[in-house]
Amino acid sequence: MSSRNAPSGCVAPSPATAAPPSPTNLRLTVGQSGSESANEPGGEPEERILQDGFWEYGRFYGNWKKGKYNFPIDKEETSRLDILHKYFIVETEDRVTSVPLDKEGSPKIMDLGTGTGIWAFHVVEGYIPNAQIMAVDLNQIQPALIPRGVTTKQFDLEEPSWEPLLRDCDLIHLRLLYGSIRDDLWADTYRKIFEHLAPGGYVEHLEIDWTPQWDGEDHPTHSAIREWSQQFHRAMHRYRRSVKVSSEDTKRMMEAAGFTEFKETKIRCYLNPWSTDRHQREAARWFNLALGLGLEAMSLMPMIDMLHMKQEDVVDLCKRVKAETCVLRYHAYFTLHTWTAKKPASPPQ
């Protein structure tokens, strides 16, 4: 079915790409003694390593370092994170990183905020098979079986010391960590990244600017997408874990940490598959799917706890956003920013 005649305006990804990336096949059903299942009572067991947590607003949240990560870690969310990774891979035409790495060698890599670990798995399974990767996250939501070459580490990146983490890395990769790091700790985070890189190593940081833009003049006067974005930004600002994107601030902090060769690229993340371009349309299908599945996860705790919105009002806002993203004449997009910088091969003279 083409995007032009889809009744709702939203189209599922094509059958050729609908299967999730191969790392998801590594999951197996496990349980940990004394830990709650991350499924509703009576449901199927979770196919991930499980950690203690709590139910709130109908979703399951992590207990470790409670209050630092205000989004769910349940099966719905981990599946959504894998789908979002698929979007990145489709959008970049199967490029897992934009920095030069030795594909025939054994580069050392850290993936900070790894989530389900799918980016790290993709690197060793299809890009650099001999890479050594430490996949770091606050939550243990990675599969119980992981590819050779990858180790997972539960760690709080806001800790003063990163002594337990991998050193002399060729690449340190971050993706969508805004909202998880306190605003006043980003400069120190870049400094620690610099310290854990080998001379000549790279940092690569990807973030989505959740402020909507539109191609052309056709967009709703009272846009649910714009309303959601404003509320989401307000809530995260009150946590002091802002999701506001500032390339100037990022460049300044990276250079203050010692990085050189700062580069930025921007990609438009279209919210629906309106385009006649096949690649752009396919990428938009995946982004539409990931966004639709993730709106409540991103919104419930921040908007209820920080803005004192009622749960039913948050759910209604998310429904209105999903409906608006399925109107093909509205060419809305968010912006994906990728920042890279290099640790000099030798100290400045």
Swiss-Prot record:
Does the keyword Repeat feature in the UniProt annotation?
Answer: no
Record has Transport as a keyword: no
Q: Which SUPFAM superfamilies match?
A: S-adenosyl-L-methionine-dependent methyltransferases
- Disordered: where is this region? 1-46
The record's section on InterPro entries has:
SAM-dependent_MTases_sf
Biased segments, Polar residues type: 25-38
Task: Give the GO molecular function terms.
Answer: methyltransferase activity
Keyword list (alphabetical) reads: Methyltransferase, Nucleus, S-adenosyl-L-methionine, Sporulation, Transcription, Transcription regulation, Transferase, Virulence
**GO cellular component entries:** nucleus
What EC number(s) does this enzyme carry?
Answer: 2.1.1.-
Protein task: Methyltransferase that performs automethylation. No other methyl-accepting substrate has been identified yet. Component of the velvet transcription factor complex that acts as a global regulator for secondary metabolite gene expression. Controls the expression of the gamma-pentyl-pyrone gene clusters. Required for the expression of cellulase. Regulates asexual sporulation (conidiation) by environmental stimuli such as light and/or mechanical injury. Required for oxidative stress tolerance. Also plays a role in defense and parasitism on other fungi.
Q: How does it assemble?
A: Component of the heterotrimeric velvet complex composed of LAE1, VEL1 and VEL2; VEL1 acting as a bridging protein between LAE1 and VEL2.
Return the protein name. Answer: Secondary metabolism regulator LAE1
Q: Which organism is it from?
A: Hypocrea atroviridis (strain ATCC 20476 / IMI 206040) (Trichoderma atroviride)
Top-level taxonomy: Eukaryota, Fungi, Dikarya, Ascomycota, Pezizomycotina
